Amino acid sequence: IYRYMKLEDAIKYYKDAFNDFDSDKAAKLLGKLGLKLNQKISQCSKGMLEQIHMVLALSRSSDVYIFDEPLAAVDPLTRDDIMEMIKSERKKESIVFISTHLISDVESLFDSIIMVKDGKVILHDNVQSLKKENKADLETIFKEKLR
């Protein structure tokens, strides 16, 4: 999306670019986040831009979603809204990849986790069995693996 656009322009742009894009869903989700369709993207904060990109991605019927630090620039309440949106609005049976340093915030979203250090996978496991085996949360496990 381009900064000169309004949100309604971004929705039209995605609708034209992707045949699996649901413009009604995008408008509904933007409204749930308190964003107005006539709002200019240039007037959006970094956190708002994260939300807009999340909505645009989740408004596609995709088998795989990839998000890079989607929670980094948002306040805690918006973070909760985004997490709930990922849970409820993604295509069922889809795969969601999230790269994040906010491990404790996304822990409840996943069935499995891949931890990467220096571009190499250092751990790939089921979240519940990993937590049970280590008797710790994912952030603690991650810190131990990085040492």
How should each PLM-predicted stretch be described?
Residues 1-52:
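ABC-family P-loop ATPase nucleotide-binding domains
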Residues 79-92:
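Helical segment within the ABC ATPase nucleotide-binding domain
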Residues 93-102:
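Conserved H-loop
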Residues 124-125:
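ABC ATPase "signature
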Residues 65-69, 74:
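Catalytic Walker B motif of ABC-type/P-loop ATPase nucleotide-binding domains
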Residues 106-108:
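A short, surface-exposed alpha-helical micro-motif characterized by mixed small hydrophobic
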